[in-house]
């Protein structure tokens, strides 16, 4: 199948919404593999339309996306097989995308799981974080120390929204811009991480 949206060079592709989407998919698959181990199998990930809009609406004219809010149908067209660039399909494969009520299911083929496992560097921080929060008696002090192990330049702020107690993020790591939000449930601590635009949308 000939791709109609191939980009001429790596720099051009890296500035696109497709590249942002691919990074997000790979990050989540790596996190899942750190939690559950690697299996060469189909992975289904779910995104709200708002998150996908952030990937593409800030991606510039090289994606040929008109100004304005991208609808569910427009997003399905953007992610249609004949519009996926070769740079994306060569790594995580021919993804399949469906949507209902602005909730998108992105199906990554076994090739994608294998690619992430064999061709991307281990995320030691995520592996250590998952192991730490899975330890009985884990404390926020220990979690904060783990962040400092990887960078002296972090931000930690208390949250009072009823869902999370605080967030921690790396301030100068372009590869990890997530807000890591933590909640102490008494017997253990849970976390969720959000991209900056999604964090802003939630109004935490």
Regions flagged by a language model, labelled:
Residues 37-60, 125-133:
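Short glycine-rich, basic-tinged beta-strand/loop micro-motifs
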Residues 4-11, 16, 81-120, 164, ...:
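Charged low-complexity interaction tracts in eukaryotic proteins
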Residues 145-179:
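A cross-family detector of function-defining hotspots
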């Amino acid at each position: 199948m000939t791709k109609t949206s191939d980009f001429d060079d790596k720099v051009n592709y890296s500035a696109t919404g497709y590249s942002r989407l691919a990074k997000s998919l790979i990050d989540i698959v790596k996190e899942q593999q750190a939690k559950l181990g690697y299996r060469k199998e189909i992975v289904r990930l779910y995104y709200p339309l708002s998150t996908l809009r952030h990937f593409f609406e800030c991606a510039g004219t090289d994606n040929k996306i008109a100004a304005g809010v991208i609808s569910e149908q427009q997003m399905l067209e953007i992610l249609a097989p004949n519009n996926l660039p070769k740079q994306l399909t060569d790594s995580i494969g021919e993804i399949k995308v469906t949507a209902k009520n602005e909730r998108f299911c992105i199906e990554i083929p076994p090739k994608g799981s294998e690619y992430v496992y064999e061709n991307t560097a281990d995320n030691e921080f995520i592996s250590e974080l998952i192991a730490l929060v899975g330890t009985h008696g884990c404390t926020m002090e220990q979690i904060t120390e783990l962040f400092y192990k990887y960078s002296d330049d972090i931000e930690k702020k208390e949250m009072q929204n009823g869902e999370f107690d605080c967030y921690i993020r790396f301030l100068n790591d372009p590869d990890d811009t997530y807000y890591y939000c933590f909640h102490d449930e008494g017997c253990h601590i849970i976390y969720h991480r959000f991209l900056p635009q999604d964090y802003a949308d939630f109004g935490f």
